[in-house]
Amino acid sequence: MGQKRQRDQKGPTLHVRKRKRTGKPTNVAERESKPEVVVGVDDLNWKEVALPDRLDNFEGFFGLEEIEGVDIVRPQGNGQLRFKSAPGKPGKSILKKPTPKSEETEFDDEWNGFSDEDLEKKEGASTVNEVAKAADVNGKKGKDAKNKKDIKAKEPKKKLKEQKEKDGAQAKDRSITSGLSFAALEDEADDDGADISAWEPLGLSPETLTSLSKLKFSTPTSVQKSCIPPILDGHDVIGKASTGSGKTLAFGLPILEHYLERERRKTIDSEEEKEKIPIALILSPTRELAHQLQKHIYGLISNAPGVNARTALLTGGLSVQKQQRLLETADIVIGTPGRVWEVLRTGQGLIRRMQGIKFLVIDEADRLLSEGHFKEVEDILSSLDRVEDGGPPDEEDDSSEENVVPGVERQTLVFSATFHRDLQQKLAGKGKWTGGDIMNKKESMEYLLQKLNFREEKPKFIDVNPVSQMAEGLKEGIVECPAMEKDLYLYTLLLYHPKHRTLVFTNSISAVRRITQLLQTLQLPALALHSSMAQKARLRSVERFSSSTANPGTILVATDVAARGLDIKGIDFVIHYHAPRTADTYVHRSGRTARAGASGKSVIICSPEEMVGVVRLAAKVHANMANGKKLPLESLELDRRIVSRVRQRVVLAARITDSNIAKEKITTEDNWLRNAAEDLGVEYDSDEFDQAKGWGRGRGRGRQERDRQVGSTSKAELAGLRAELKELLSQRVNLGVSERYLTSGRVDIEALLREEGNNSFLGQVDPLGF
């Protein structure tokens, strides 16, 4: 019983045979026996090839059609070429689709008048109907219900679809017409909105007023009061106002009003839009500003009842295909010039649709229209002003009068805090320097009229603050220090403001990377932002810096990519680690604080080499100062005791940071050389390469030697430096107070226990003098 029964391996296997599949070969034979469909050129289902709007080297090659899945049948002799379906391709798929009979006979039936035959047919049909009625009198009652059901069941679906569309249009009409009264304001009784009585003189719609109430915008700013009425009246406007004065709403509200007017007109006229044409195109110089504009306008739209306007954001770093799909249904297009031009140039029919926009908004116009910066802006403007003549647009013949729109129907809105070209002149240098009036209206108008094609000969120039473009609540200061001790004075300034959200500006990407690592080594919450970062990383840094749940002492180290238009609430302090190169850069940098009537501080850390540029800066920005100040930039004196106490911290952090950066640089260079040697099939020896590189005396030799020495720091040495720095950071900066006898000095013990005041210092610290 314990033994298993063994199978006879030989007997059964000799007689078992695999079943042959006979069905498939017969089907193949039948399939092969079927005659192949051979057709001519005109019988194929040709598909037109979609071409982009802007072509470079096609040279008039249009009307291209293609077909896939066909083989060429070459006839004997010189006959006409024939085609058949490729193997594995159904024959019907390559044939042209037959037109329905209804379409064929729709235009073939013509009325030829009355004839005697038609009258005889009608008389015969009437007699047959009378006989049928007499025969079915008794069974009429029993079939009425059934006939009604059949009629209802056989109702065409087209009528149901039309009814649904009609009901939807009526519902939409009710939603918009209901917004014509102030009933929309009563629907949100539970939400404590702001008092918007100050907005009523501007003549805005109830939907817009509801949105402003929800967003807590109780009072319009001076630029909004001055710009909104002429924009609503259809004028071209050039608006100049200080940073943080609400320029986004100054052009966003008229765009929303035009959208509401267009929707009301469509419902009254019962018009169906054949093709979606955007209302406005808004251009901005940076991606962060474009994202911010989209966020503000979307908030304005989403809080307005019955408004379903769509926005499309076109910036670099994101998918082009997705942005093209968003552009198909967009009402408002916001983007940077490079990506907007790329999407328009590679799309089909997008330039023609964009020519129908009603508003062209150029935010931060002095930056977008500056010489040699944004060539795509000129391409966009020329394409919007071009008339289609039935052929491809000729890029070389831009000056021809035949291709330019004679009368532009769109409004052009231009906004910035600085328009004068003199502000874009470099402050440092030996070139000719011109001071004077920075708000020369005549030169600004001539400069803009040369660049833009306005609808009016003289657009309205609205200057809200002609004397100074700096915010009223902004305090400006300067800290003088040696060139090699900027890190020390930067850290000291940050210790003076521990709970202030600070923005540090530099002039280079390498400085952003180094300062960010330095501050992080000093255990400060620092974030980086520059143009070489990936788009998602840039958005992540801005989101973390502006988050309400973030550390109130968060520091953002950025290049001038964050200088324009970035509206982040709670920025109290702006530090210029490097003196700005131009005066308009200083204006926009300092404008990140003291926004919307709030107060803020702006400090320049100035070395002796930068003093000439800072003096010119003060002369340009504060040329027409009328407040009676002798010095527009106050000189700040830091406590020398604090500077000497924290010097060792900064020295240790700088050694650690420089070592890490040098090691990363050496590793990156070594990996690049190793990969290049592998591609060339050459053996790579790092020691031999370094020895060969040391023979020369080229430029940068000293820097390379210094990087090699700094990068040679061992891990044990770095660990010792980190431990020493950690010990120093765990202690407060002692300003001459005995730690054993705290009550003997000027120390507020109760404030220390409650953790009030500046926790970085132990002792009395006088605040900065501004």
Swiss-Prot record:
Quote the Pfam families the UniProt record gives. DEAD (PF00270), Helicase_C (PF00271)
According to UniProt, the reaction catalysed is: ATP + H2O = ADP + phosphate + H(+)
Q: Where is this motif: DEAD box?
A: 363-366
Recorded GO MF terms: ATP binding; ATP hydrolysis activity; RNA binding; RNA helicase activity
What CDD domains does its record include?
SF2_C_DEAD
**Location in the cell:** Nucleus, Nucleolus
Q: Which Enzyme Commission number(s) are on file for it?
A: 3.6.4.13
Quote the SUPFAM superfamilies the UniProt record gives.
Answer: P-loop containing nucleoside triphosphate hydrolases (SSF52540)
Helicase ATP-binding domain location, by residue? 228-437
Q: What is this protein called?
A: ATP-dependent RNA helicase mak5
Q: Which organism is it from?
A: Emericella nidulans (strain FGSC A4 / ATCC 38163 / CBS 112.46 / NRRL 194 / M139)
